[in-house]
Amino acid sequence: MLDPNLLRNEPDAVAEKLARRGFKLDVDKLGALEERRKVLQVKTENLQAERNSRSKSIGQAKARGEDIESLRLEVNKLGEELDAAKAELDALQAEIRDIALTIPNLPADEVPVGKDENDNVEVSRWGTPREFDFEVRDHVTLGEMHSGLDFAAAVKLTGSRFVVMKGQIARMHRALSQFMLDLHTEQHGYSENYVPYLVNQDTLYGTGQLPKFAGDLFHTRPLEEEADTSNYALIPTAEVPLTNLVRGEIIDEDDLPIKMTAHTPCFRSEAGSYGRDTRGLIRMHQFDKVEMVQIVRPEDSMAALEEMTGHAEKVLQLLGLPYRKIILCTGDMGFGACKTYDLEVWIPAQNTYREISSCSNVWDFQARRMQARCRSKSDKKTRLVHTLNGSGLAVGRTLVAVMENYQQADGRIEVPEVLRPYMNGLEYIG
């Protein structure tokens, strides 16, 4: 959520920045609502003051032995008017808040202006895509060769965009997540967390999934007698529960940064992606991801973004997977991000780079929703923290990249050296 004072005092400047990311802010409507809010605020305060004054007069008149019935009726009438004014003010403030919850974050000044993914800017590349002297197989073919990917079984169990992994392919999938967690906790300074996969509405509002992206979530549908659980949803990313761990907290600045990681399944309806990536593991309703989250002082967030992106890059480098780093343009950034780097890994069968990590600085956008603050020992005043999140990495897509980049002419898959300790020294699948 944006700073309400910024919306009130600099609406045109806010509108101009939002226009860079293709969002039209209705300045006139917000201005009219704000003017009405001011009028109601003054009216409410005046009625409250008048009611307090009249109530005091009742006591004074009673002490003098005077008739207080007319004063009592007047105070009652003022009370009714005050209640009505408060109700109108509350409704108006709720309307303003509802609008504010649909407004995306402002882009950082250095973010390239653009409409969509075609306007993203490549920053760097690492590694050289391998030249194969045989016909490249995609991960689906390789998975079926080794009886490791069973999409038909998943359709029987659930439906499309799910998979059953088996044998050494399933083991490599597990090895990848363990390798990522060990790297982030042992070398990058993150603490490992195990979090709920179901979260409530407040949690989803805190990180910005609600109200705008309710259609992207899988919501629980409880029995009537269990209606208290009706507001749960499956997490679309571990960013949601991890970031909300600081919701409503005031953190000692000496304890910052807080760096957290978690390996979880992620659940997404993939609304709007019908017909895209229908083959294989690239776009699933359920997929695993190792997530990184940082809670930092405001002045440290841009440096933290560079650090976090480097942590995701390190995973790819140790796995020996060629990738490129891009900065997303204003029109392609996520709702809450002010600046985002994507890492795209080389997928040989598609002869292109595909997203495998997205690392974002969210500034105080989520912190304002969550009321997550920090305070230094020398200053009693609190301020909002900055939050960052990043994939470190998407496990399924990393599995795809390893299978395809490490395939052999005979269909075997070489196990990257860094994964072998997690696979009992296995050098090849097949």
Curated annotation (Swiss-Prot):
Its main location: cytoplasm. GO terms for molecular function: ATP binding; serine-tRNA ligase activity. Coiled coil: none annotated. GO terms for biological process: selenocysteine biosynthetic process; seryl-tRNA aminoacylation. Its EC number is 6.1.1.11. It catalyses: tRNA(Ser) + L-serine + ATP = L-seryl-tRNA(Ser) + AMP + diphosphate + H(+); tRNA(Sec) + L-serine + ATP = L-seryl-tRNA(Sec) + AMP + diphosphate + H(+). Pathway: Aminoacyl-tRNA biosynthesis; selenocysteinyl-tRNA(Sec) biosynthesis; L-seryl-tRNA(Sec) from L-serine and tRNA(Sec): step 1/1. L-serine binds at residues 237-239, 291, 391. CDD domains: SerRS_core. It is found in: Cytoplasm. Keywords: Aminoacyl-tRNA synthetase, ATP-binding, Cytoplasm, Ligase, Nucleotide-binding, Protein biosynthesis. GO terms for cellular component: cytoplasm. ATP binds at residues 268-270, 355-358. InterPro entries: aa-tRNA-synt_IIb, aa-tRNA-synth_II, aa-tRNA-synth_II/BPL/LPL, Ser-tRNA-ligase_type_1, Ser-tRNA-synth_1_N, SerRS_1_N_sf, SerRS_core, tRNA-bd_arm. It is an enzyme of class 6 (ligase). Homodimer. The tRNA molecule binds across the dimer. NCBIfam families: serS. Catalyzes the attachment of serine to tRNA(Ser). Is also able to aminoacylate tRNA(Sec) with serine, to form the misacylated tRNA L-seryl-tRNA(Sec), which will be further converted into selenocysteinyl-tRNA(Sec). Consists of two distinct domains, a catalytic core and a N-terminal extension that is involved in tRNA binding. Belongs to the class-II aminoacyl-tRNA synthetase family. Type-1 seryl-tRNA synthetase subfamily. This is Serine--tRNA ligase. It comes from Shigella boydii serotype 18 (strain CDC 3083-94 / BS512).
